């Protein structure tokens, strides 16, 4: 899946380089399309086709109420921010402070294509692959093992150290939600909300504030012109802080239940059987190489 998608991305990258060399302007939406198209239109279909050949476990679906859904959602916030801090610090440390998050270039693009990919397409396809396809096939070896493996593969899939840790943490919550409900709509909706908050609302609020104008601004006109933006941004930031604190409390107090299975792997054999096989090793090595390339770029 990854190799086919990256191969197509390289071809599109050569096309992009050729256009730039010939002084042809490339809009942000086209760059976004070149990045997303190979993975979601080529890599994922191949991945789904391969996974179909692996027997899966079908379990009864269980519903959750709105209150529990909201509680699980806000548990993602402290995990997301803590993971983001770890990923950013580690990226800066390993690159000598030179690394930049490639995703930032696209998040401030206001094209409808970005919203479609980030908020709709990515959550649906990623949850279908990393939650349903993987967990349905691995949960018989232990629910904890399946969730951890799913989250690890999900984190590596981003091939971006800035995103790796918070993707892993959020993947644990989404994996738990899917494992307990076996209903994909809950994890998809959570994923959509998280991506909407980080990929649409946050860039929109930041772009509504003219930071350059406010730097050292002493005149009242400059302050007044940004006042509404600051009020909205501050209210949103305060709400996130409150919800993040609530998420920490819920994480500490909520009991997470895991059911045992007949074929559950013994503790001493889990890592060897799950992560030390040829497929997992090749996938991990490939993603790590791409992460290193991204840091060095």
Each predicted region: which residue ranges?
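Alpha-helical transmembrane segments
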Residues: 1-10, 71-82, 279-287
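Small-residue packing motifs within transmembrane alpha-helices
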Residues: 1-3, 9, 32, 39-43, ...
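Hydrophobic membrane-targeting alpha-helices
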Residues: 10-15, 45, 49-53, 81-89, ...
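Membrane-helix interface motif
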Residues: 10-22, 85-96, 197-214
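Membrane-helix interface linkers and caps
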Residues: 16-74, 92, 102, 244-265
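Juxtamembrane helix-loop-helix connectors linking adjacent transmembrane helices
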Residues: 21-30, 56-128, 136-139, 292-297
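Transmembrane helix-loop-helix hairpins at the membrane interface
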Residues: 113-296
């Amino acid at each position: 899946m990854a190799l086919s998608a990256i191969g197509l991305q390289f071809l599109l990258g050569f096309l992009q380089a050729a256009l730039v060399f010939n002084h042809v302007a490339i809009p942000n939406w086209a760059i976004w399309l070149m990045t997303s198209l190979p993975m979601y239109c080529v890599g994922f279909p191949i991945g789904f086709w391969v996974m179909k050949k692996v027997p899966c476990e079908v379990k009864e679906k269980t519903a959750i109420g709105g209150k529990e859904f909201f509680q699980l959602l806000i548990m993602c916030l402290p995990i997301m921010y803590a993971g983001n801090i770890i990923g950013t610090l580690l990226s800066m440390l390993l690159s000598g402070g030179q690394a930049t998050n490639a995703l930032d270039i696209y998040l401030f693009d206001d094209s409808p294509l970005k919203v479609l990919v980030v908020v709709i397409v990515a959550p649906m396809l990623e949850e279908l692959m990393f939650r349903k396809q993987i967990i349905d096939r691995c949960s018989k070896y232990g629910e904890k093992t399946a969730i951890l493996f799913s989250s690890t593969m999900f984190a590596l899939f981003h091939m971006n150290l800035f995103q790796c840790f918070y993707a892993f943490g959020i993947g644990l919550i989404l994996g738990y939600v899917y494992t307990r409900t076996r209903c994909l709509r809950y994890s998809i909706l959570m994923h959509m909300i998280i991506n909407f908050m980080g990929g649409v609302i946050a860039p929109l609020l930041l772009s509504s504030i003219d930071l350059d104008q406010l730097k050292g601004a002493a005149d009242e006109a400059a302050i007044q012109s940004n006042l509404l933006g600051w009020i909205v941004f501050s209210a949103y930031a305060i709400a996130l802080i409150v919800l993040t604190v609530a998420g920490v409390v819920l994480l500490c107090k909520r009991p997470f239940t895991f059911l045992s299975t007949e074929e559950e792997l013994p503790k001493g054999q889990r890592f060897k059987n799950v992560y030390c096989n040829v497929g997992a090793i090749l996938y991990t090595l490939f993603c790590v190489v791409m992460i290193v390339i991204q840091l060095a770029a």
